[in-house]
Design a protein with these regions (language model features):
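Short inter-helical turns and helix N-cap capping residues of alpha-solenoid HEAT/ARM repeat scaffolds
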Residues: 28-29, 60, 65-66, 94-99, ...
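Alpha-helical oligomerization segments
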Residues: 219-221, 234-237
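Amphipathic alpha-helical scaffolding segments comprising HEAT/armadillo-like alpha-solenoid repeats
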Residues: 9-24, 45-61, 81-93, 112-127, ...
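Structural detector for internal amphipathic alpha-helices that build alpha-solenoid repeat scaffolds
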Residues: 1-11, 30-45, 66-82, 99-114, ...
C-alpha cells in the first residue's frame, strides 16, 4: 500500500473496496457520493467495478439525482467492456436487488450468443435455490421471453414449480411462445392442480393456447376452468377465439 492509499488517495484494490461505503451513502449531501463515483471511475480495477455496481442497490432523493447518478455509473461500467463482465456476474449472483441494471449491462457488453449463455447459466443457478425476494428470477425470466435459443425452454421449465406465483407466471410467459413439447404436461398439471391460484391458471391457459398444445388427458378439467375467449376445439387443442391460426399473422 502506498502513501496515497494511507491518506485517502491512490488507486489500490483496497481503496476501491473502501469507497463502496461512500457510494452507498443514502443520506446527507450528494457530494461525497458523487466524488467517490468519480474516483472509482478512474480506477481500472475489478474492485472498483464492484463498488460502482453497489450504487444500483440504493435509491436517493430527489429522484432526478438518483437517476442521473445511476446512468452515470452505468456508462462508467459499460465503458470497461469485457473487463466488467465477471464483476457484473458476481454482483448478480450475490445480490437480489438491482438485477435489472446488471442484465442491462450484460446485454450491452456481451455479444448476443454469450449473453444468452449468461442468462441460461444464471437461470440454472436460480432454479436450484429458494429466494425470499423473487425480483432476480422475474428479471431473468423476462429476459428469457425474448431470446430464441434451444436452451431457454428446458432451463425455464423448473420455475413452474417455484414457490412464488409471480415466478410461475413469469415462467409461463417465457414458455408460451417457445411451444416446447416437454412443457405441455407440466403446464396442464399446474393449470388443473386444485391449489393453483386463479391468476396462475390464467397464465397457464394463455401459455398453453400460445403453444398450440392439446389437452388430451385433461380435457374435462381444463374446460371447467376456461374463461372466454378460450375453448378446446374438436381436436383437443386449446385455443383463443379470434386468434390467428398457424402461419397467420395477428
Amino acid at each position: 500500500m502506498g502513501i496515497l492509499d494511507i491518506f485517502g488517495g491512490g488507486k489500490s484494490p483496497e481503496r476501491a473496496t473502501k469507497l463502496k461505503a461512500k457510494v452507498t451513502q443514502k443520506y446527507g449531501g450528494p457530494e461525497a457520493r458523487q466524488k467517490a463515483i468519480q474516483q472509482l471511475g478512474e480506477m481500472d480495477l475489478p474492485e472498483a467495478t464492484a463498488s460502482l455496481l453497489a450504487r444500483f442497490t440504493i435509491t436517493v432523493e430527489p429522484a432526478t439525482t438518483d437517476t442521473d447518478e445511476k446512468e452515470h455509473v452505468f456508462g462508467l461500467i459499460r465503458s470497461r467492456g469485457e473487463a466488467a463482465v465477471e464483476p457484473i456476474r458476481t454482483f448478480l449472483r450475490r445480490n437480489d436487488q438491482a438485477s435489472s441494471w446488471a442484465m442491462r449491462l450484460l446485454r450491452d457488453v456481451l455479444p448476443a450468443d454469450r449473453y444468452v449463455t449468461a442468462v441460461v447459466e444464471h437461470l440454472r443457478e436460480l432454479s436450484e435455490v429458494y429466494t425470499r425476494d423473487p425480483e432476480k428470477k422475474l428479471v431473468l425470466l423476462h429476459e428469457a421471453q425474448s431470446l430464441d435459443d434451444s436452451r431457454i425452454a428446458p432451463t425455464v421449465l423448473p420455475f413452474l414449480e417455484d414457490m412464488a406465483d409471480d415466478v410461475k407466471i413469469g415462467a409461463l410467459r417465457a414458455l408460451g411462445p417457445k411451444a416446447y413439447p416437454e412443457a405441455r404436461e407440466p403446464m396442464l398439471k399446474l393449470l388443473t392442480a386444485p391449489e393453483t391460484a386463479r391468476r396462475v391458471q390464467t397464465g397457464a391457459i394463455e401459455a398453453i393456447a400460445h403453444s398450440g398444445f392439446g389437452v388430451q388427458g385433461y380435457r374435462e378439467k381444463v374446460e371447467a376452468l376456461l374463461p372466454e375467449p378460450f375453448f378446446v376445439d374438436k381436436a383437443g387443442i386449446l385455443k383463443r377465439r379470434g386468434a390467428p391460426g398457424p402461419g397467420q399473422s395477428e
